[in-house]
């Protein structure tokens, strides 16, 4: 204890007691304005009704608390135990941190996040707050504090926190609350008769304030109190070097439990910042560097690997694949490392466009990485509009990681997308609809971000393009109203189809049968002028999608399916990836006759799908042609002089398309395959539709690794035919070509992890790892081919009479 003339206190360095706080109560109501209006509207999201959005009574929440200093985590996160609340959200639980009072730096901050269990696999933040342990006068805070909870975000531990728990106020309520704290701590003399009136008045003002701020929530915490105040004082460093207590003159070995984490890494960087410009690795170090560079993108670099890359950074400037790894090693909050990285970055060999996508991911969101993101955009500018369209969906997602405050020119990526989209309406139309969908996602916390971007982009359009977008919006809105109205009718499907045609021909939706040219949102290359009423249809499905024939300005008909109540964002993503893979294969002169039809989500549960005509479900083909695909091809494309009596180009197309889709569905983990979502065209193309299950998910037990059904093999002439041998050869060739573009594929997936697509966002890291696992990047091309052939052989074995248990289960998969 230290004593001055007027003030007695303890030094914090003299308190060897673990720091603890008490979590008391949560007050106020959560802001639900962004929530869906009813649970029934989103009944498919079966867990949502159990979350805090739909329960006005108490809910089972839990809290995590972490200590931060200088923007870095000091301790592990401590959390409250399970507590089923019955009346109010009241914990009254003490959290004990592993650090003692004497260990706490002056800028130590408590970062608190309140969590709600959204589903068995997902948690969402109710809100977060942060609170400095020491006041500006260096005295440790104590007693009860009422902290503002910043809703729908985690507590922020940065030095300039975005979730301050205490906001300085100037009103009477704020002044009285400060006085009440002093009163509770007996820093103000008590006067019983006067205190009664004062406390009642404070209570009245508090209730009035709560009614004004009804959508704010507060957490009350209680900090430890001691007999005397605690003044911050650091431990003095020893001025001598402790010697061994033994008399022997020998080295003393000390076990450093943190050795694997390299606690001296930062100092090493400082001491070696401008060294090693001419240093070259030896054989062992070179192998280590080579192994690191072979790692997939988004792989976390260990401390040991980071030191190796940092040491030979100048040597690596000639290797364009090394730049992203080097930038991941940089501690961007450290000014010396930031300056060194930014100075060496322009000297590096320019990276590929595929690698530039990694620099736009969530790994580079620190305020000091703005130049890294700007560099990535400069690389991206090399892509033409056709190539850019293949990445546009992910680039729109990457805008959420930009430092954007409403001015597009401050963000290199946003300004680039605006510029390119303004120059090309095909690009601009897709850009607009991607922004539109993300601006209305109720499951996303980025709605306002995308709404702002959408409005800013629309304002920048010239008069012609603005009219085009307005026409698209009106067309989609009218289709949506028509679909909803038909769904509400309590009549048979046949009657609904009849009603649909009447409504389009002469009813209230007659305007949809004839209008001024509109760029079709799903394919802006096409201009449409109306719907053909007599060819309109409603498909047999729970969602009752509309089948429409659209008249084009070229006098042709273009078929689309308009869906309401169906989230097409996942299908849109998979079709985009299939289109990209088709392009990658064709660049290597391998055309596998894929059919990447077009899909566009126009709202969270609305969208348009291009129809592929003519085409027919495999189940229907087998039913009509005695279970024989060859009969189907022979009927439409006979050639008496060719094997099986079928035109050679048709068989070639069938074999190639089977190979392409087998490999792609394997890499993407497409599930729930059956004969109704495999389609055939008369000219031999096979293609897949409906991608509700991806990344290995499947409603059926033990799905086969390769989506190859018996009918496909028989359609090639059987497993011993030359066509099947060619099929296997094409599979291996396609697989290795796509493996070479693994960085591009994985980077595109990484940019989608925060897109609120459940199959990906439910487990972000695992989603990317599942694709990475299928690519088998650790294998050589020959090893990868052998692995794929083994999978094909296992699948074929399962399809034909071989008595093994697993084969039987895989055969049942296709029969289900």
Swiss-Prot record:
Residues 532-800 form the PI3K/PI4K catalytic domain. Residues 688-709 are annotated as: Activation loop. Gene3D superfamilies: C2 domain, Phosphatidylinositol 3-/4-kinase, catalytic domain, Phosphatidylinositol 3-kinase Catalytic Subunit, Chain A, domain 4, Phosphatidylinositol 3-kinase, accessory domain (PIK). InterPro entries: ARM-type_fold (IPR016024), C2_domain_sf (IPR035892), Kinase-like_dom_sf (IPR011009), PI3/4_kinase_cat_dom (IPR000403), PI3/4_kinase_cat_sf (IPR036940), PI3/4_kinase_CS (IPR018936), PI3K-type_C2_dom (IPR002420), PI3K_accessory_dom (IPR001263). GO terms for molecular function: 1-phosphatidylinositol-3-kinase activity; ATP binding. Pfam families: PI3_PI4_kinase, PI3K_C2, PI3Ka. Residues 669-677 are annotated as: Catalytic loop. Residues 39-186 form the C2 PI3K-type domain. SUPFAM superfamilies: ARM repeat, C2 domain (Calcium/lipid-binding domain, CaLB), Protein kinase-like (PK-like). It catalyses: a 1,2-diacyl-sn-glycero-3-phospho-(1D-myo-inositol) + ATP = a 1,2-diacyl-sn-glycero-3-phospho-(1D-myo-inositol-3-phosphate) + ADP + H(+). GO terms for biological process: autophagosome assembly; endocytosis; pexophagy; phosphatidylinositol-3-phosphate biosynthetic process; phosphatidylinositol-mediated signaling. One of its GO terms (cellular component) is cytoplasm. It is an enzyme of class 2 (transferase). Keywords: ATP-binding, Kinase, Nucleotide-binding, Transferase. Its EC number is 2.7.1.137. Residues 538-544 are annotated as: G-loop. Belongs to the PI3/PI4-kinase family. This is Phosphatidylinositol 3-kinase VPS34-like. The lineage of its organism: Eukaryota, Amoebozoa, Evosea, Eumycetozoa, Dictyostelia. The gene is pikE.
């Amino acid at each position: 204890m230290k004593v001055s003339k007027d003030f007695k206190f303890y030094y914090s360095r003299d308190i060897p007691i673990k720091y603890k706080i008490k979590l008391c109560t949560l007050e106020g109501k959560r802001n639900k304005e962004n929530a869906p209006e009813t649970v029934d509207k989103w009944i498919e999201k079966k867990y949502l009704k159990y979350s805090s959005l739909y329960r006005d009574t108490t809910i089972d929440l839990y809290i995590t608390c972490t200590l931060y200093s200088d923007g870095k985590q000091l301790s592990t996160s401590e959390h409250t135990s399970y507590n089923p609340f019955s009346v109010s959200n009241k914990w009254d639980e003490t959290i004990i941190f592993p650090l003692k009072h004497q260990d706490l730096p002056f800028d130590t901050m408590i970062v608190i996040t309140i969590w709600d269990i959204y589903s068995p696999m997902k948690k969402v933040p109710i809100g977060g707050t942060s609170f400095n342990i020491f006041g500006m006068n260096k005295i440790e805070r104590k007693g009860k504090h009422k902290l503002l909870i910043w809703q729908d975000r985690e507590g922020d531990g940065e030095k300039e926190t975005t979730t301050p728990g205490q906001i300085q106020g100037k009103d009477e309520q704020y002044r009285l609350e400060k006085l009440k704290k002093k009163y509770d701590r007996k820093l103000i003399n008590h006067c019983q008769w006067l205190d009664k009136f004062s406390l009642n008045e404070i209570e009245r003002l508090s209730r009035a304030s709560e009614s004004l701020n009804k959508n704010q929530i507060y957490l009350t915490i209680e900090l430890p109190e001691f007999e005397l105040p605690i003044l911050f004082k650091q431990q003095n460093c020893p001025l001598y070097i402790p010697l061994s207590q033994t008399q022997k003159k020998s080295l003393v070995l000390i076990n450093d439990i943190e050795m694997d984490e390299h606690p001296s890494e930062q100092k090493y960087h400082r001491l070696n910042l401008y060294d090693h410009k001419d240093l070259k690795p030896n054989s062992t170090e070179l192998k280590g560097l080579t192994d690191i560079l072979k790692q997939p993108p988004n792989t976390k670099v260990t401390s040991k690997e980071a030191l190796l890359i940092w040491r030979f950074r100048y040597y690596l400037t000639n290797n364009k694949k090394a730049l992203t790894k080097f930038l991941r090693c940089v501690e961007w909050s450290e000014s010396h490392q930031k300056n060194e990285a930014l100075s060496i970055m322009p000297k590096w060999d320019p990276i590929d466009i595929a690698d530039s996508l990694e620099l736009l991911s969530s790994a580079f969101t620190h305020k000091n990485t703005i130049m890294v993101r700007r560099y990535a955009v400069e690389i991206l500018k090399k892509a033409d509009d056709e190539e850019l369209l293949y990445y546009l969906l992910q680039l729109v997602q990457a805008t959420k990681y930009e430092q954007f405050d409403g001015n597009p020119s401050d963000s290199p990526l946003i300004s680039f997308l605006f510029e390119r989209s303004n120059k090309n309406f095909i690009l601009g139309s897709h850009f607009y609809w991607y922004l539109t969908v993300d601006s209305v996602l109720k499951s996303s916390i980025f709605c306002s971000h995308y709404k702002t971007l959408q409005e800013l982009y629309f304002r920048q359009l010239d008069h012609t393009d603005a009219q085009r977008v307005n026409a698209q919006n009106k067309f989609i809105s009218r289709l949506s109203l028509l679909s909803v109205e038909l769904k509400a009718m309590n009549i048979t499907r046949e009657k609904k189809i009849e009603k649909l045609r009447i409504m389009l021909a002469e009813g209230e939706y007659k305007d949809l049968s004839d209008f001024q040219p509109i760029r079709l949102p799903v394919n802006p290359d096409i201009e449409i002028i109306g719907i053909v009423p007599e060819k309109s249809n409603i498909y047999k499905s729970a969602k009752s999608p509309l089948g429409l024939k659209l008249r084009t300005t070229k006098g042709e008909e273009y078929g689309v399916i308009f869906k309401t109540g169906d989230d097409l964002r996942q299908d849109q993503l998979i079709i985009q990836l299939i289109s990209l893979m088709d392009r990658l294969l064709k660049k290597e002169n391998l055309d596998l006759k894929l059919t990447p039809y077009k899909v566009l989500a126009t709202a969270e549960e609305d969208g348009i799908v291009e129809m592929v005509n003519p085409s027919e479900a495999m189940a229907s083909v087998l039913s009509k042609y005695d279970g024989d695909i060859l009969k189907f091809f022979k009927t439409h494309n006979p050639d008496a002089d060719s094997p099986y009596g079928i035109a050679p180009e048709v068989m070639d197309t069938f074999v190639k398309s089977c190979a392409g889709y087998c490999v792609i569905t394997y890499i993407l983990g497409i599930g729930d395959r059956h004969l109704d979502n495999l389609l055939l065209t008369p000219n031999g193309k096979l293609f897949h539709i409906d991608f509700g299950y991806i990344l290995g998910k499947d409603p059926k037990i033990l799905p086969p690794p390769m989506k190859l059904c018996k009918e496909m093999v028989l359609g090639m002439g059987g497993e011993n035919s030359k066509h099947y041998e060619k099929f296997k050869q094409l599979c291996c060739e396609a697989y290795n070509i796509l493996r070479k573009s693994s960085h591009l594929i994985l980077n595109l997936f990484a940019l989608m992890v925060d897109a609120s697509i459940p199959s990906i966002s439910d487990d972000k890291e695992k989603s990317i790892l599942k694709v990475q696992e299928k690519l088998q990047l650790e294998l050589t091309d020959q090893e990868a081919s052998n692995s794929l052939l083994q999978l094909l052989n296992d699948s074929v074995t399962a399809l034909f009479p071989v008595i093994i248990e697993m084969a039987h289960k895989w055969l049942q998969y296709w029969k289900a």
